[in-house]
């Protein structure tokens, strides 16, 4: 059966824990505090006892009548001729003269007694309340009246009745000793009279009902007012006591200082007298010494150093040194030591005679209304926060059933339960991770709605290889960037900004090759509008479909630009029909996508395309807050030999300034310089503006988010923390050998690997190369990218390649002279490329050559042994004749006897007559010897063969 704590029961029924504990003790339950547990049946008993106490039944109402209490602060209005009682009105409590009220009530009751002529004792006193009792007769009331003069006996009787009262009135008995003392005092002052209140002389059945709830509310209000007055009085008394204690401390301090000064004067006088006595003693000692020396000189014989010997003594001490003078010096030292000792005693006496410092009283601190806690706080920390002693909290925890010391950590539930016991609202502290950059992008409160302004749209151009993406962007920028691209492929994302009709548009150019899937996905994630360019003569291609999927995943609108309409084989209608199969439906067909037919080469309909972009941007309502600290995304990153790490950033919110402390991905730094898309230095960059910055300590990854921090210290801490987390995550991803994956590990050991080190000019090319090489499928071989980074090939790359037996692949970079010299010395291969599919083809060939060769057996010829010759120290020589094919010197041979192979090995020698030959042809004779085999016999068949490697296709 489950148990409940008393404070939980009190919370359920709306009572205080103290009342619930008293009820439980009265019912005979073994409880100690509000944290004690009881069975569920006992809990029901406690709850039922409260319901009985608050709503008495018919029997109780017949046996005991509650006695009205004079309540000057409560006004009860009754209707004439009805038993309805109006709602009580509680006035503001005022200070009362209880003694005067008691005397007035006694006089009023005496007057009523004389007016009525007969008195009936109908009320008894219980805990300060008058209760009607139908079991008491008028005769008993008269007896009580006659015994009222016996003060001591009546007092004892009242206490006895208060202790033996019926259990149906437990709610009144819980008032305690305070109400019993009121009962004694009220009895002595004549409050126990046998008169009923005015209007109560009619029979009980006709008496109006008593509104117990109103009385209880009035009594509660009176008790609260009294408690507030007592609290105020107690507070003032404490303040007065503190003031008096402070005065007493000041007086004691002054008295101690005065006593100390007097003691110092006495000590100085004593020291002066001691010094005078010592000087007198010294002078007397010196005079005595001089007289003794003179006497000794007269008596002694003239001898050298005679004052230091004793000739008058007998035995061992004769003719020995006399230490009288030294003893005198010692005595003098001892006297000085005693003087210092007395002085020290005097100092100690000063400390002991000073008045003891008064014990300072502990200041009373109010409990806080709220308490913000963190998981794992210790008892000492909680005590310091709420300004309480740790021992007090340890005691409370012990009463709650929790054994803890002041240095022990507590969980959140225990802290909340402890704060509930103190009456404090507990709240868990929300930890803010300063190293989390993503929270700036997700927090809606980061932007100020009052400062929101319209921003330029970010447009990404996507499409298949050589469909005219870079040519279109080149036409927009009036430059010829496209002609310089290697192999007709854009190698990395370029971000550019143009102005049309007074409004700015930011363009992102993405590569179209299959290797740059991640770069296209990154471009779609930061864009607002996608321009899908499709060649009118080629139609929909694989990368076109991929671009459609990226745009749909990013949830951005698509504008289709049908390019190359100037070519003879252009068919725009076919392109529209093919795109409709993938959900890209033109507005002319009832869809949502805008289609524009252009010719990027001849600058045809380009203005119409830009107008369409601005129209879609206006519909999207693109907004930004330029007043907050800047956040955005890394478009590209590279390592420059002279400038260090360079990152191309796209500002999405806020304004980026020079010298701003910034965290980019897992690195940090301060913006040293900013360059826009035209190569000009700028001091700030507003939302939707692409800029290249320097000043980072490391090269970030393309696609990382960046955020500006308040100061460099916070940025450094966040960057270092993010770097540690990335390193820890990388270590966790490293698989270790266990019994579960042991078989997979052994199986993986059978697969050959080609180790490569990739160095490229930009981070996007590094990612594309690594992804493409890993995807190469050659059975039994896989590519292992040992290291990849941006920048030139240096000596450390060559050292790593030598240690890991790897090939260095440089993409649009060159090795340093020192690295090239070291590579020649260490025999490390360096391959340099500028077109990505050439790299893929070369690595694929290397992977095929890495496999173990597959050999096929090829029979060269057969021979028959005609004669055998045994030569000592040489072995058996077999004379043979070739019957088919030929026998070569480097071939392997099998010895077949009776169609059974009895030996397989290599030839030791092959001769034609006496000459060593490389081969013996068909129908020719010769002699041979076989390595490690001498059991040749006549008519044995010799089969010659070689193992030939099969070329992989």
From Swiss-Prot:
Domain of life of the native organism: Bacteria
Record flagged with keyword Cell inner membrane: no
Keyword Cytoplasm assigned: yes
Compartments (UniProt record): Cytoplasm
GO cellular component entries: cytosol
Biased composition annotated in UniProt, kind: Low complexity: 322-338
Region (G5): 599-601
Name this protein carries in UniProt: Translation initiation factor IF-2
